């Protein structure tokens, strides 16, 4: 254990949590560790990751705004001259970025007038914040000693020494890096190290995986796996749908031209892909999958704007990064240029469509889930653009409208407003992807009335999830409705667990008995059934805590992979990290593996086979 300093963000958070006894308000503190110290540390770490995620995202946003405005530093807002303390940082999170510009208070508009509304749930209070503390509850007066290898330097180039106020230190540390150089080849006035999305991904994976043995997956691995998997999935989708037998993308490209397949129809087929990473971690595979799908569209000659007009640019992947070039030059967004605007809008909405419709992830670690969502938002932020035409009012639960408020005067970019982000968080979920209460198959003998009810619930479920993704003004209420529908669908699930099956059978037996009169003998049987059910419910409740407390129900969680009747149909591709294991470490498990997976078992280490398993 290294030296701990009260001024560090982590220690400051830990101490506030302890002095206020906030573990006692958590429903299940045991999920954060085996003892009190570990629980406080884990809760504090999760809170700090949430806050740092927001700050890193905002630093990238700030870099984008400055780049869009030709280096105009008046668009910088994440510094001590704009943010005095943790109170004002909390105000920035929840009263600025989470509130539409025209709904902000007068004092907030005066102080933060040129900061756009983003709509991201990243700037909504998390469940853990709601239960414990917000960032404004941290102590402002504390200082932190400067690291001996600090990047902060004096005007003479020498490293600074001594200590600084923690928040000021954090702002100056972030400002020592260049967050606005994504894809840019311009010479910087100051020699700053570049922090882009890929570098942040590595940082996230190291922060998040240092305790649980997670490995950083090199870009060439995620690129290769996504390229091989998704290209096969695209070919299969086109061949199956169109009755073709194309062997590669070149043949498919020629077939699209020869058959004069409408551009929008070809795009719709690609957009119907469903890709899942069941151990998503920080989202590296999903980001690579996003890039690969856009690259495939470009290669097939179907990458087009909302009117179906093809883009006049080339899209390739190099070093796990999406590279967009126009006339052999790296594309850079110029919001006053109509063609540049068209390309930027198209790339943003292509990413939005793919993330919303095609990419899904699950992880047992809530910190991983938060980081994965952040990485996908960052990918969208790379192509954020200014809207130049007014939009209708936001969606309402009654339907109608579009997903953004109209621009307000005094917005960013001389009356323009930055396009808001969709609610993509619902595609990345927390849970144990290996444990489920319910089988994927539905009930085998569901009566017609039951099938009709299941279909109605599935239709409503799909509708609400689509509605949620498109920025409703009442997100919390929609989330609640979605959870209620999910629980209603569970009534049509087939239990996996034998104890749960037995409990359901006993309840069904009791309900059948209630249809008839009760003799003394039947009353005794009924009483015995009640006692058995009560005992079984108690035992299963204990099992719920031990085994199923974070179970993930694949049968119901993603309505996008349910058919019209509400039955599970699955994903087109499941991708993920191959297991990094030693043969010796699993020798005791080999007999069980052979019994469970005889089709794949070969007795020797083969990570491809174990990855499939």
Features from the language model and the residues they span:
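Short, hydrophobic/amphipathic alpha-helical patches that form generic packing surfaces
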Residues: 47-62, 205, 374-381, 463-466, ...
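SAM-dependent methyltransferase catalytic-core segment centered on the flexible catalytic loop
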Residues: 284-346, 436-467, 488, 494-498, ...
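P-loop NTPase motor core
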Residues: 346-362, 367, 419-446
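Glycine-biased, low-complexity coil/linker segments
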Residues: 225, 397-400, 409-414
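Preference for the N-terminal adenyl/adenosyl cofactor-binding alpha/beta module
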Residues: 1-295, 305-309, 333, 358-371, ...
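Conserved Class I SAM-dependent methyltransferase catalytic core
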Residues: 46, 225, 353-368, 464-475, ...
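Short mixed-charge
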Residues: 239-266, 298-351, 381-390, 415-423
């Amino acid at each position: 254990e290294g030296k701990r300093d009260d001024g560090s963000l982590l220690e400051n958070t830990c101490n506030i949590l302890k002095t206020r006894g906030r573990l006692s308000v958590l429903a299940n503190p045991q999920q954060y560790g085996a003892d009190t110290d570990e629980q406080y540390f884990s809760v504090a770490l999760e809170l700090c990751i949430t806050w740092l995620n927001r700050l890193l995202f905002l630093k990238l946003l700030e870099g984008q705004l400055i780049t869009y405005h030709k280096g105009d530093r008046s668009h910088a807002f994440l510094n001590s001259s704009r943010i005095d303390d943790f109170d004002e940082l909390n105000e920035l999170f929840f009263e600025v970025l989470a509130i539409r510009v025209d709904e902000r208070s007068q004092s907030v508009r005066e102080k933060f007038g040129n900061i756009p509304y983003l709509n991201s749930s990243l700037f909504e209070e998390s469940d853990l914040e709601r239960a414990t503390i917000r960032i404004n509850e941290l102590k402002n007066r504390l200082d932190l000693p400067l690291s001996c290898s600090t990047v902060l330097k004096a005007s003479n180039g020498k490293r600074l020494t001594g200590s600084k106020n923690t928040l000021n230190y954090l702002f100056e540390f972030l400002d020592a890096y260049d967050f606005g150089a994504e894809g840019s080849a311009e010479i910087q006035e100051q020699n700053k190290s570049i922090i882009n999305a890929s570098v942040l991904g590595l940082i996230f994976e190291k922060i998040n995986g240092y305790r649980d043995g997670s490995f950083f997956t090199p870009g060439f691995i995620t690129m290769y796996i996504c390229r091989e998997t998704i290209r096969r999935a695209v070919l299969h989708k086109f061949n199956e749908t169109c009755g073709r037998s194309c062997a590669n993308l070149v043949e498919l490209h020629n077939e699209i031209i020869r058959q004069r397949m409408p551009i929008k129809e070809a795009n719709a087929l690609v957009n119907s892909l469903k890709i899942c990473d069941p151990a998503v971690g920080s989202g590296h595979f999903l980001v690579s999958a996003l890039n690969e799908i856009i690259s495939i569209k470009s290669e097939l000659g179907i990458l087009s704007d909302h009117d179906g007009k093809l883009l006049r640019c080339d899209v390739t992947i190099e070093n796990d990064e999406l590279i967009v070039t126009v006339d052999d030059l790296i594309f850079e967004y110029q919001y006053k240029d109509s063609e540049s605007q068209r390309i930027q809008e198209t790339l943003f909405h292509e990413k939005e469509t793919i993330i919303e419709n095609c990419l899904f992830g699950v992880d047992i670690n809530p910190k991983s889930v938060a980081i994965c969502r952040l990485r996908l938002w960052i990918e969208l932020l790379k192509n954020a653009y200014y809207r130049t035409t007014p939009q209708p009012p936001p969606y309402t639960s009654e339907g109608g409208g579009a997903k953004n408020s109209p621009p307000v005067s005094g917005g960013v970019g001389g009356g323009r407003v930055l396009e808001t982000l969709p609610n993509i968080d619902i595609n990345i979920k927390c849970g144990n992807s290996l444990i489920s209460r319910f089988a994927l198959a539905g009930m085998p003998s569901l009566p017609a009335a039951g099938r009709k009810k299941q279909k109605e619930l599935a239709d409503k479920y799909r509708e609400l999830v689509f509605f949620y993704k498109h920025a409703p003004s009442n997100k919390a209420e929609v989330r609640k409705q979605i959870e209620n529908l999910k629980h209603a669908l569970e009534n049509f699930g087939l239990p996996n667990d034998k104890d749960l099956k037995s409990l359901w059978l006993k309840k069904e037996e009791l309900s059948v008995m209630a249809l008839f009169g009760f003799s003394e003998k039947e009353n005794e049987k009924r009483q015995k059934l009640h006692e058995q059910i009560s005992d079984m419910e108690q035992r299963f409740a204990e099992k719920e805590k031990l085994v199923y407390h974070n179970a993930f129900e694949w049968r119901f969680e993603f309505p996008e992979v349910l058919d019209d009747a509400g039955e599970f149909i699955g994903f087109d591709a499941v991708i993920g990290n191959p297991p990094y294991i030693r043969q010796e470490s699993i020798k005791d498990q080999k007999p069980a593996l052979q019994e469970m997976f005889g089709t794949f078992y070969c007795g020797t280490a083969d990570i491809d086979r174990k990855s499939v398993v």
